[in-house]
Curated annotation (Swiss-Prot):
Subcellular location: Virion
Protein name according to UniProt: Structural protein V8
Keywords: Virion
Sequence segments annotated as region (Disordered): 14-35
Family statement drawn from the similarity comment of this UniProt entry: Belongs to the sputnik virus V6 family.
Major location (coarse): virion
Length: 184
């Protein structure tokens, strides 16, 4: 293809709506409530087990709040902060603030069992893992860190996705704020 063909005038009028699709597939199911036909269309509110939009809205459980999360491990003393959460039915979003201090011990970061409130725990999975950016001795690690939420409410954070421990040093170790979203 030459450069001159790239600059040829476009003779196709994109605003002309008279052209129709000629290769439209036929309805393979014969049903009227499919993508092939909009008669008898089932609206999205039926996903929530409701017969109409008002009932669907009433079926949505929305909850927000905070809980205190104390993490310990590589630091001289535990660090506590308020963690914000939003829960919509079985979808949970956690917003976790900065946890960072000088590492005085070679260790991963962990909470006690039960630190994650019962209504926010991943009960259908023994654990949920997320990769996050972490700092080890003041430097962001090459490999992403790993946060693990256990069904018993414990939270574990590793220096990398190989379950590495944070190293002792004068720079800060931990992580900057982040959010994670998961299903329970």
């Amino acid at each position: 293809m030459s450069v001159s063909t790239l600059f040829q005038q476009n003779n196709n009028n994109i605003y002309n709506k008279s052209n129709t699709l000629t290769n439209t597939p036929s309805n393979p199911t014969g049903n009227t409530n499919t993508l092939w036909s909009n008669s008898g269309f089932n609206p999205p509110h039926l996903m929530y087990g409701a017969s109409d939009v008002t009932a669907a809205i009433n079926n949505i459980a929305f909850e927000t709040g905070t809980f205190n999360l104390q993490l310990s491990g590589p630091w001289a003393s535990p660090i506590s902060h308020a963690v914000s959460y939003t829960k919509i039915n079985n979808l949970v979003n956690l917003t976790i603030p900065t946890y960072q201090a000088q590492a005085t011990t070679l260790a991963s970061i962990s909470s006690i069992v039960g630190a994650l409130p019962t209504n926010l725990r991943p009960v259908n999975n023994p654990e949920i893992d997320f990769e996050i950016f972490v700092l080890d001795n003041g430097t962001r690690t090459t490999n992403p860190g790993l946060i693990t939420l256990l069904s018993n409410g414990q939270i574990l954070i590793y220096k990398d996705n190989n379950l590495g421990q944070f190293t002792v040093g004068s720079g800060g170790s931990g992580f900057n704020p982040f959010s994670i979203t998961y299903m329970i």
